[in-house]
Amino acid sequence: YEAEEIAAEHNGLGKIAAARSDLLHADLAILMEPTDGVVEGGCQGTMRFTLDVAGQAAHSARSWKGRNAIHRLLPILQILSDWQQHDPHVLVEGLRFREGLNATMLQAGVAGNVIAPSAKIQINYRFAPDKTAAQARTAMEELFADWPMTVLDLSSPARPGLDQPLATSFVAAVGSQPGPKYGWTDVARFSELGIPALNFGPGDPMYAHKDDECCRLASLDETLAALVTWLDQDDVIKLAGEGGRP
């Protein structure tokens, strides 16, 4: 489905859920997210927002006549830097999630000889599933209370839920120690629908968006083999039947 990586309003799975949720009825959803063949439970929530900083334009040769909005970003950057000093790990249902709060984009400047009259910084907060989207938003609004905030995207996290019978069966079939999902995935949407979901697929997520991003060809075969092995087990059909879904 389209638009999985951008703002929630464009997400194709969300549109299906809104228009024909019956098409998504299932006992277990397996999201083929890159996990390098390891089951990853739940997912982080994500919040993207901008903060606006005002200044006053002036010629850079007479900078004292203006107010540099770029320089006035410093307190925000200091908050972000200070935040990195605390322990970002949060334990949820036995899985150790790591939160992140980072500046990802800056917009400022008019010309090379003009003091910037305004600046906008975009920040991405990746939060653990021990909190709701509303709680995450409140935390950010309190942390950056001194600046006008515009929320661009806010998506709920999902708790691991690996104690569900089919999920437990799949973890056992894969045979590796499950871990947390660093990032937001559509397990959150299935969670909202009351459907157990987990992440499992080829490709090492630690290479995502890096210059050397790649996927081992063998990882495709290993993932397929794990899925086939699990689906061939008799108890999978039995557990699915006990799920009570049509």
Please report, for each region that a protein language model flagged, where it lies by residue.
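Acidic/histidine-rich catalytic neighborhood of metal-dependent amide-processing enzymes
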Residues: 1-44
